[in-house]
Amino acid sequence: MAASTNSFLIGNQTQIPSLKPKSISQSFIHFTKPNTINLTTRTKSVSIRCASASTTVGSEQRVINFAAGPAALPENVLLKAQSDLYNWRGSGMSVMEMSHRGKEFLSIIQKAESDLRQLLEIPSEYSVLFLQGGATTQFAALPLNLCKSDDSVDYIVTGSWGDKAFKEAKKYCNPKVIWSGKSEKYTKVPTFDGLEQSSDAKYLHICANETIHGVEFKDYPLVENPDGVLIADMSSNFCSKPVDVSKFGVIYAGAQKNVGPSGVTIVIIRKDLIGNARDITPVMLDYKIHDENSSLYNTPPCFGIYMCGLVFDDLLEQGGLKEVEKKNQRKAELLYNAIDESRGFFRCPVEKSVRSLMNVPFTLEKSELEAEFIKEAAKEKMVQLKGHRSVGGMRASIYNAMPLAGVEKLVAFMKDFQARHA
């Protein structure tokens, strides 16, 4: 990368120089020691020039983070946020200091929505809401907004998150589990032809990708009730591939796995479904309130929305979700092949046709070696590989921000570990 220059104003205290990414579209920026640093005093500018050199995975100070969420963010996005942190675009303030009703933040949230609409090709008949409370809060918001206390709703439970959504809905309506994978330890997705849907169900709810168990819907069921809608929790595969939004009444997702930091929940809802909340619905769970106020009814998670906007911009510059999906398929194929070709040393319990592109759970034939595997991987700067406490084993979350080189390093380590312990 050619040397770049970043100038900003500082106060009496010297500031740590920031690194300006060369392009928001590049996933990893690698750098060497700055060759020019001129620190000055108040009202004078500071000029920082950074030379960079290419390396394999990323800067040597950073680990390869396989966390399920909060998860890794694109390094170039982090560096862009760093360069804007002190003085966003000459505004004289950080995004964290802005009024959420000021013109600066309005431009941020409006661009974030516009870019997300472009990424997912969201029809104009849908509203986009930037909310708080995580996807878990939506487990209650959905029945409160879409049905009455005695209304029927259907749930397909393919993992822990689908199960939690169903249990929360029991407080507010009459939900029914029409299929559960619990008896087979959540390793499958049902065939849709055999589903016995309730004829009067207001909605059919699925979790499109189960983060813990690594099960992903590759297609989506049709709702038999002509007045019902399909609802999907897409927290852990949101913006990982193209989705036909028109098939759904509501799509919701916590941002912290694939498109931003924790603290932001995105809801995409068909407009005709808004405005039917029950009287008991808390104001913060009423979709109409948030829609009428453009997600600004109360103070939103401003910095989190800003970060999501940077991620959306990055995904667009990569060529959109079709290109992103190709990259994700390549990473997942590499890792699953390593597991399947290990002659049973590594094992993935999930049925091959529904294996997640995002979350790859696996175990060792010799379970007593799993702790050693995680320990040795950490020494190689590959972290957060321990499986969820409810299932054990290992789990590699390889979201959009995970570079191919990170998966390649994990696969090389797996093969070396097998050679030493088989």
UniProtKB/Swiss-Prot annotation:
A single GO molecular function term of this UniProt record: O-phospho-L-serine:2-oxoglutarate aminotransferase activity
Keyword Amino-acid biosynthesis: yes
Any Gene Ontology CC annotation: chloroplast stroma
Chief place where the protein resides: plastid
Pathway entry: Amino-acid biosynthesis; L-serine biosynthesis; L-serine from 3-phospho-D-glycerate: step 2/3
Domain of life assignment: Eukaryota
Alphabetical UniProt keywords: Acetylation, Amino-acid biosynthesis, Aminotransferase, Chloroplast, Plastid, Pyridoxal phosphate, Serine biosynthesis, Transferase, Transit peptide
Top-level EC class as recorded in UniProt: transferase
Residues where N6-(pyridoxal phosphate)lysine is found: 257
Cofactor(s), by name: pyridoxal 5'-phosphate
E.C. no: 2.6.1.52
Residues engaged in binding pyridoxal 5'-phosphate: 135-136, 161, 211, 233, 256, 298-299
Binding site for L-glutamate: 101
Residues bearing PTM N-acetylalanine: 51
Keyword match Acetylation: yes
Family: Belongs to the class-V pyridoxal-phosphate-dependent aminotransferase family. SerC subfamily.
Its job: Involved in the plastidial phosphorylated pathway of serine biosynthesis (PPSB). Catalyzes the reversible conversion of 3-phosphohydroxypyruvate to phosphoserine.
NCBIfam families (alphabetical): PRK05355.1 (NF003764), serC_1 (TIGR01364)
Name of the protein in question: Phosphoserine aminotransferase 2, chloroplastic
Source species of the chain: Arabidopsis thaliana (Mouse-ear cress)
Gene encoding the protein: PSAT2
